[in-house]
Amino acid sequence: MELRVGNRYRLGRKIGSGSFGDIYLGTDITTGEEVAIKLECVKTKHPQLHIESKIYKMMQGGVGIPTIKWCGAEGDYNVMVMELLGPSLEDLFNFCSRKFSLKTVLLLADQMISRIEYIHSKNFIHRDVKPDNFLMGLGKKGNLVYIIDFGLAKKYRDARTHQHIPYRENKNLTGTARYASINTHLGIEQSRRDDLESLGYVLMYFNLGSLPWQGLKAATKRQKYERISEKKMSTPIEVLCKGYPSEFATYLNFCRSLRFDDKPDYSYLRQLFRNLFHRQGFSYDYVFDWNMLKFGGAREDPERDRRDREERIRQGRIPLPRVMLPTSSGRPRGTQEVAPAPPLTPDSHTGMERERKVSMRLHRGAPVNVSSSDLTGRQDCSRISTSQAHSRVPSGLQSAVPR
């Protein structure tokens, strides 16, 4: 039996989950296009999918915003069908052994600042800026950074008058503690400055491999947040950014200097990193670290990789991996800090053998429904049969969808 949503999208296997929704691979039966289908039980205590889909719709048309194809209800489930995307930056960070080159960090920073600026221009703040919420596109959009997960987004000003929300204190921490701004830790209402400060921590995370306040232990969630806050506030920006170009410290100092309702100078921040990019002699060829690892670990010879990549493009081969779907976390308010991702230690292969196998998979174009754990070499998933896919679909949806 064939399961459909919106009488157009065939439901496939489950490929991700969040705190208030599961994500399935789907297929548009009219065009054959693969899509991501997010389901949320209508009986959930705090429904979020309808709100999130409305925000996505307000963002439609922006560069790096996933296309929403259909929203509605099927049986016991709220449904959102959206464009299928590639791996998250967190997945790619793990694939690259938890270290990005300066060139890759700067290429990402330029696009990430623009995504945040666009969201702000639409009168919203994201409030959960982290590597998991930035995904790469697929195919021709493989070099494009997308921003996802508006489950915690909030309107910060009136759309017509641009009246800013009032300054408030004693707010609970919203977002992910690892990347939260200092003002967020202090209980101050979030605004545009906080999204950008969080991005600064993400960039240093990419540079360093981890942040000084990761891995702290505490008896309770509140105590852990306090320990993270104390470590963050006691670590001077210059110490955090030591050994890296001064632009990273300049960026964070600028963000922390903004007042609550200030409009950030996004162009200034982008130009900071663009000037550094040019001084380093880098080329805007959009060859990221994972592209070089993908084709046999040619990290030492970027010029050869560029020539190989151009040859693949001339031959009509897709230059980027199709490795997974968007893993929108859908994390509810008060998201907990998560532990650092484990090191890449395969169960039965050496690191070199694992990298070779992953590179070979990417070289031949891994299917889009491969899980993120497969990307890091932990397991080898293949497409499941139709009967298996159906067995994973909630029964409330099975009874509601036309056979």
UniProtKB/Swiss-Prot annotation:
It catalyses: L-seryl-[protein] + ATP = O-phospho-L-seryl-[protein] + ADP + H(+); L-threonyl-[protein] + ATP = O-phospho-L-threonyl-[protein] + ADP + H(+). Exhibits substrate-dependent heparin activation. Residues 9-277 form the Protein kinase domain. Casein kinases are operationally defined by their preferential utilization of acidic proteins such as caseins as substrates. Central component of the circadian clock. May act as a negative regulator of circadian rhythmicity by phosphorylating per1 and per2, which may lead to their degradation. Participates in wnt signaling. It comes from the Eukaryota. Monomer. Interacts with per1 and per2. Component of the circadian core oscillator. Keywords: ATP-binding, Cytoplasm, Kinase, Nucleotide-binding, Nucleus, Serine/threonine-protein kinase, Transferase, Wnt signaling pathway. It is an enzyme of class 2 (transferase). This is Casein kinase I isoform delta-A. The active site is at D128. The gene is csnk1da. Its main location: cytoplasm. Residues 322-403 are annotated as: Disordered. Its EC number is 2.7.11.1. ATP binds at I15, G16, S17, G18, S19, F20, G21, D22, I23, K38.
